[in-house]
């Protein structure tokens, strides 16, 4: 049994996750000693939880397009780890989108998993929850400012806006993103996946 399987069992045994474990819903994350990139998003969506595939929706299609890689490579490579801020679908919010990831979840499990991935080059931080946790006081005053200043976080972290169709307006207002941030993302991906 690998260390990642042991951690998975610990997560399932944690009382914080008992409702999921009782309903036979395992945590959704992917970790590997060969991982060079870690993608940290908010939490699995309903479809991801049902299909057991991260980013298995329109947001994932856009993310893979931004990265410049195929769906097959995205799911098959051990060089990409997936550590959402919560490993379980938190439910639908009253407004658009999903309920935020549970407080304390990433703090408890991410350090244990990251410690076991010695080859990590860059942690890709998708959305404000991931950015606030990993960048903490180094974050800008809002997501736009944090992402605009992406170069100051490299090479350890790369903040991205969420690739959701709900963010099309943001992308139109911030055209610098696809001209500056996406090329930087592709350089990182090429260096770590395709060499």
Predicted regions and their residues:
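A polyanion-binding, active-site-adjacent surface
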Residues: 1-193
